């Protein structure tokens, strides 16, 4: 993906491949793997999730994907926020009766996402607030002594505990999701214990990819969820526009 963004060719053996050629090879191999699960059925759509949606990158990926899968296959691009929204919406409703938190642990620290729903609006308007915590950047502990590791992990645990406590105190949170290999039991002790009090907590790495699949299905085969809940991203107008109308003798909104 870095080659695609930089529009840089790559040398493989004696041949030089353009970014589009490399992605086309990738898509063909990927489709070969999925053939065992689809039983030879044609794919209706391919969904890709990217941290940032860049037009040039998306255009190249769309061309490569369409060339590999065929023009009948729709190509969708979804942000991590949209994938988070779609994933949560397709979970049991008791998991999102209140706000939902997601902590994504990357190399540069923790990125948090908070899903909020305004259930007084029709359709239900959903917003996602984001925040970055660079102070949680993971350090290489391979050269540390056991005592140094313990001290570092304790400091990390206390820092994350402060982050979740500052948010959760006085608020209603139904569930929280921890993404990334850096969330381990080596350090995530007091913070995890606090987070699990009265909330459902899950850990994994494939939430965004699953959310992309749910989102693609909603675009191809819309369910009632698509009309009942609307996610307002940064590209959308953050306002509800409504008016009172007369239906017979009754006034409705």
Label every model-predicted segment.
Residues 53, 61-69, 89-92, 98-103, ...:
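ATP/nucleotide-binding catalytic cores
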Residues 46-58, 160-195, 200-205, 210:
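Glycine-rich phosphate-binding loops at beta-strand->alpha-helix junctions
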Residues 70-103, 207-225:
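Conserved phosphate-binding catalytic cores of ATP/NTP-utilizing and phosphoryl-transfer enzymes
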Residues 1-50, 54, 129-166, 173:
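Conserved phosphate-binding loops in N-terminal lobes of ATP-dependent enzymes
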Residues 1-13, 66, 74-86:
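Early-domain small/polar-rich strand-loop-helix modules and first-structured segments
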Residues 207, 214-253:
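Acidic, glycine/GT-rich loop-and beta-edge segments that sit at the periphery of enzyme/chaperone cores
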Residues 1-6, 88-130, 244:
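Gly/Thr-rich phosphate-binding beta-strand-loop-beta motif of the actin/hexokinase/Hsp70
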Residues 26, 60-67, 191, 211, ...:
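Alpha-helical scaffold elements adjacent to nucleotide-binding pockets in ATP/GTP-utilizing enzyme cores
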């Amino acid at each position: 993906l870095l080659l695609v963004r930089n529009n840089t060719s790559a040398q493989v053996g004696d041949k030089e491949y353009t970014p589009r050629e490399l992605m086309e090879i990738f898509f063909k191999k990927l489709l070969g793997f999925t053939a065992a699960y689809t039983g030879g059925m044609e794919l209706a759509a391919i969904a890709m999730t990217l941290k940032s949606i860049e037009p040039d990158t998306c255009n190249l990926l769309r061309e490569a994907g369409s060339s590999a899968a065929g023009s009948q296959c729709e190509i969708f691009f979804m942000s991590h926020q949209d994938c988070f929204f779609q994933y949560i919406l397709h979970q049991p409703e008791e998991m999102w009766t209140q706000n939902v938190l997601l902590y994504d642990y990357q190399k540069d620290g923790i990125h948090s996402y908070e899903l909020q729903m305004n259930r007084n609006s029709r359709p239900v308007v959903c917003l996602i607030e984001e925040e970055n915590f660079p102070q949680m950047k993971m350090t290489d502990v391979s050269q540390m002594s056991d005592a140094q590791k313990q001290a570092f992990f304790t400091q990390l645990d206390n820092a994350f505990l402060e982050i979740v406590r500052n948010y959760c105190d006085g608020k209603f949170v139904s569930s929280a999701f921890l993404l990334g290999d850096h969330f381990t039991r080596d350090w995530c002790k007091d913070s995890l214990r606090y987070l699990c009090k009265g909330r459902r907590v899950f850990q994994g790495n494939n939430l965004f990819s699953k959310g992309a699949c749910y989102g693609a299905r909603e675009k191809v085969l819309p369910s009632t969820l698509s009309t009942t809940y609307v996610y307002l991203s940064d590209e959308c107008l953050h306002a509800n526009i409504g008016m009172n109308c007369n239906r017979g003798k009754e006034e409705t909104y």
